[in-house]
C-alpha cells in the first residue's frame, strides 16, 4: 500500500510529560490529545492506548515510552509520555533526550515527591531546555492556599536545578476531570467545561513559552537507533529521532558503535506511517537501509554522515552524583567502580578509573551529592563526542548524570 506523504505545514516540537508516579502524566497526555482532537488537532487517544505496556498494565505503571501526536493552531507536536516509576528512569533517559520542552506534572494533593526531583535533575542533565508545570488534581484540593504552597515548593526545586523557577508557568487543573468530560462528549467546545478549558490554557502556554527549537539542520546528520526491524522484501529499518542534520533518500550513512563501522545507503524514509523524501533534525523516523541484515545493527548504534563521528571507549567527564533523596546511592564509591553508562539509546558497562573535585583536587572516594570530574573507560566503543550527556546507573538506581568534557581514546 502506498503511504500518504507527511506534510510539513507547521513547525514541529517534541515535548513530553515528566513527574512522579501516579501524579497523572498519562491521564494528562490523554486529556491533551482528546481536547485538541475536539478542536480538530489530531486523533484523541484513550488512557489505555497510551499506557500500552502490557506486562505492567496490572499495576498501572507505564514502562514503555509512548509516542502520540497532536496539533495546536500554531504547531505540530510529538509527545512522549515518559515513565514515572524510578526503576524505569532508563527509559526517561532515552525518552527525555527527545524533548524540546517538558510538562512537569505535580499532584496538587501531594506536592513534589522524590521522583519529581529526580526527573527535574534528569531533564537538566539530558538537556531539556524548558519546563511548564501542570499542578494536577486541583479538584481534590479544597484550599487554594495548598495549591499556592505546592507552586512555591516546585519553583524552589526548579531553581535548585538551574531552571528559571521564578518564570516557569504553572497551570492548575485536573487531567481526570477534563478527560472524563471529553470521554462523555468528545465534541465539547471551548467555554463549555472549566476543566477542559484548563487543558486548552496549558497548551496555549506550551505554544508560547516553549520556543520553537532551532534545529541542528546545518550540522552533519546523526540519529541514535532506538529499534530495528525487517520488512520482508525491502530490507532492514532503523528507527529513532534525528538528532541533527538532514538525511535524504540515496544518501550514504555510517553505522557507528558497538562493533566495526559499516557504510550503507538510505533507500527509504517514513514518519508516522507516511513517506518522506528527506528527514530533518527533530523527526522521529524510520530509515530503510540497503544491504544490511537485521543482525548487523542494534539499538545503541548511531547512523551518521560518513566520517562525522567516531567510536570511543575512554573519556573525561563532569558528573553530578545523586544523593539518596534523589534516588541515588547511599554509600560512597571508589576508583575501579563499574556501573552502566547510558548514552543516547544504549547502556554500556564502564569502569570509573579516576576522579577529582570540580576544582581538580584529588579525592579518594566519591560521596552521594558530590560533583566530580572523572575518567572512564567503556568495555565497548560507542559514538561519543564532547558535550554529550549521559547517565550512570547501577542495579535500577541512577547513580549520576554527566557530560563528556574530553575524548581520550
From Swiss-Prot:
InterPro entries: EF-Tu_GTP-bd (IPR041709), EF-Tu_GTPase (IPR050055), EFTu-like_2 (IPR004161), EFTU_2 (IPR033720), G_TR_CS (IPR031157), P-loop_NTPase (IPR027417), Small_GTP-bd (IPR005225), T_Tr_GTP-bd_dom (IPR000795). Gene3D superfamilies: P-loop containing nucleotide triphosphate hydrolases, Translation factors. The keyword Plastid applies. It is found in: Plastid. Its EC number is 3.6.5.3. Residues 136-139 are annotated as: G4. Residues 81-84 are annotated as: G3. Mg(2+) binds at residue 26. One of its GO terms (cellular component) is mitochondrion. Residues 10-214 form the tr-type G domain. It is an enzyme of class 3 (hydrolase). It catalyses: GTP + H2O = GDP + phosphate + H(+). GO terms for biological process: mitochondrial translational elongation. Its main location: plastid. CDD domains: EF_Tu (cd01884), EFTU_II (cd03697), EFTU_III (cd03707). GTP hydrolase that promotes the GTP-dependent binding of aminoacyl-tRNA to the A-site of ribosomes during protein biosynthesis. PANTHER family: ELONGATION FACTOR TU, CHLOROPLASTIC, ELONGATION FACTOR TU-RELATED. This is Elongation factor Tu, plastid. The lineage of its organism: Eukaryota, Viridiplantae, Chlorophyta, core chlorophytes, Trebouxiophyceae.
